[in-house]
């Protein structure tokens, strides 16, 4: 069964603003930079624009810090807090550029939990069409201990079994009930305890999975 862990911030609930003097980078959906400028006046945005037409690195960081700090306190308190073996996590981003932003911020946020301030090389990776051999990446995410967090758009949304997956995180909203069911369904695959421990050594069993909802995707009809 799925359990929902909801993360709310000021921006996701009430919107925010790009302040006068802030640097703005405009990109295409694929992440190609088309324009960069410094704002001369305040630009307000509402919650519905966040992570759609507006990507806020500060907002992503707050979500990732909340997630990090909840793993071994709220979600998996019975596990030994080994940061190199956090539960396998799949994050859904809105597009390729958003996915890249998330990967970079995950690296920074989780690095704080490692002694030398560096996360393992394969700890978080992007699985999108721009990321190279996606079939190999999906296989490695399924079987390798070092690969803990995958960030994707829709590539891993359907037809992909990652049985050790224990967290599905939504950093984008979904308005299709069929797609939403397929996306959250990535987490519901069962796995025997010995197989789980092969890739997540501090786990004992998979009796549920978590939907980490950063955008309210669990709270509205599709």
Question: For each of these PLM feature ranges, what is it?
Answer:
Residues 67-78, 110, 141-154:
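Structural motif corresponding to the C-terminal cap of alpha-helices
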Residues 63-73, 100-111, 184-194:
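Short, well-ordered amphipathic alpha-helices
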Residues 85-95:
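Conserved RecA-like ASCE P-loop NTPase motor core of nucleic-acid helicases/translocases
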Residues 123-221:
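Conserved RecA-like P-loop NTPase helicase motor core
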Residues 2, 12-17, 100-101, 179, ...:
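Short helix/loop capping segments that flank catalytic or ligand/cofactor-binding pockets
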Residues 1-86:
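Interdomain helical connector at the RecA1-RecA2 junction of SF1/SF2 helicase-like NTPases
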Residues 70-87, 115-119, 195-202:
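Short helix/loop segment immediately N-terminal to the Walker
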Residues 73, 93-126:
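Conserved helicase motor "Helicase C" RecA-like lobe of SF1/SF2 P-loop NTPases
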């Amino acid at each position: 069964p799925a359990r929902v862990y909801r993360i709310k911030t000021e921006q996701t609930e009430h919107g925010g603003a790009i302040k006068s003097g802030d640097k703005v980078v405009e990109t295409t959906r694929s992440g190609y930079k088309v324009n960069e400028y410094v704002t001369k006046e305040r630009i307000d945005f509402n919650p519905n624009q966040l992570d759609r037409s507006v990507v806020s690195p500060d907002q992503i960081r707050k979500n990732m810090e909340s997630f990090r700090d909840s793993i071994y306190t709220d979600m998996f308190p019975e596990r030994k807090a080994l940061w190199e073996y956090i539960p396998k996590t799949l994050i859904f981003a809105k597009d390729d550029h958003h996915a890249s932003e998330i990967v970079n911020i995950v690296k920074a946020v989780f690095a704080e939990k490692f002694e030398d301030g560096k996360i393992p090389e394969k700890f978080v990776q992007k699985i999108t069409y721009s990321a190279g051999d996606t079939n190999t990446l999906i296989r490695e995410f399924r079987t390798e201990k070092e690969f803990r967090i995958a960030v994707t758009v829709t590539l891993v949304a359907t037809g992909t079994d990652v049985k050790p997956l224990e967290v599905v995180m939504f950093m984008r909203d979904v308005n299709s009930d069929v797609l939403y069911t397929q996306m959250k369904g990535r987490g519901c695959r069962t796995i025997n305890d010995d197989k789980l421990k092969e890739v997540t050594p501090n786990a004992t069993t998979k009796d549920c999975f978590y939907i980490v909802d950063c955008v309210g995707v669990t709270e509205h009809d599709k």
